[in-house]
Amino acid sequence: MRTIAIDAMGGDNAPEAIVEAVLKAKAEMPDTKFLLFGDKEQLRKLIPSDQINDQLGVVATTEIIADEDEPVKAIRRKKDSSMVVAANFVKEGKADALLSLGNTGALLACGIFIIGRIKGIARPGLMPTLPVQNSDDGFNMVDVGANAKSKPEFLLQWAEMASYYAEKIRGIQNPRIMLLNNGSESDKGDDVHQAAYELLKDSDLNFQGNIEGNELLLGKADVVVTDGFTGNAVLKNIEGTSSFILHILKDSLLNGGVMTKLGALMVNGSLSSLKSKFDTAKYGGAILLGVNAPVVKTHGRSNESPIYFTLKQVDKMIKENLVQDFKDEFATK
């Protein structure tokens, strides 16, 4: 039976939304065990007594890593936090994967320092799936913040892992790989990006060249590789812009005149489609590529739906032996 360790105390809607998602996933995934780490009393109140069985368990912890905690200090000092205890279960082989909605930096630290890097991987990278305008498939972008500074060989390894993920987990044949840069020409960018371009071009990947920031959502790439500093800034920009657009539309329609509101009723289906396009819940969470087990981060504001989809994503990663394939591949390099 596959086992997912879940930090039940991380995120704005914890533990209620997490328990709701787990109960829904449990009913659909009979070969998967869910271990919830957190305040035992709170969790027991939320879980019907008949649901506690071989497929669902609670591991009592007494501490929580808060969003404002300094990541590395937090995982060292809060040994009995829900996140750290869950990470140690994965390290010790008592669980196959770790999921959290909590402090991103602390989760990255748990992945790197507790669960550990895959032999042969220079630096793990954080990878979400983001929407595009002409497809429901979206695209993967890595790294979006696990590393402040990057070397060309880091970007090559991230591209290799992301390409394999896109093919095996998302079902995309021969994924198109592109390098985020400040121009489409091969000589664009600083020394790191120029060197990364050459490494990607000489690899066995389906490398399609550079991509600029204004093209990211056009569906030109299945995987976009970038340094962590730039990737994090771009990710926040995409999230902020989508939120801004939806807010402006909603405000205009609700505060407009009678004719505006009548018009809104007529285009309600199109507006719902637009909102759905920006909704990344169906893609699951962001993956820390390059560590010894699946470590996945879901947005801290998530409700039941994105958590549920992330549980399905994590389960598929375990089922498909994704991390073991990475270990086999990079051990020989």
UniProtKB/Swiss-Prot annotation:
Keyword Ribonucleoprotein assigned: no
Single GO biological process annotation from the record: phospholipid biosynthetic process
Catalytic reaction equation(s): a fatty acyl-[ACP] + phosphate = an acyl phosphate + holo-[ACP]
Enzyme class: transferase
Subcellular location field: Cytoplasm
CC annotations in GO: cytoplasm
Pathway: Lipid metabolism; phospholipid metabolism
Main location (coarse class): cytoplasm
Top-level taxon in the UniProt lineage: Bacteria
Keywords from the named record: Cytoplasm, Lipid biosynthesis, Lipid metabolism, Phospholipid biosynthesis, Phospholipid metabolism, Transferase
Role noted for this protein: Catalyzes the reversible formation of acyl-phosphate (acyl-PO(4)) from acyl-[acyl-carrier-protein] (acyl-ACP). This enzyme utilizes acyl-ACP as fatty acyl donor, but not acyl-CoA.
Subunit structure: Homodimer. Probably interacts with PlsY.
Protein name: Phosphate acyltransferase
Native source organism of the sequence: Lactobacillus helveticus (strain DPC 4571)
Gene encoding the protein: plsX
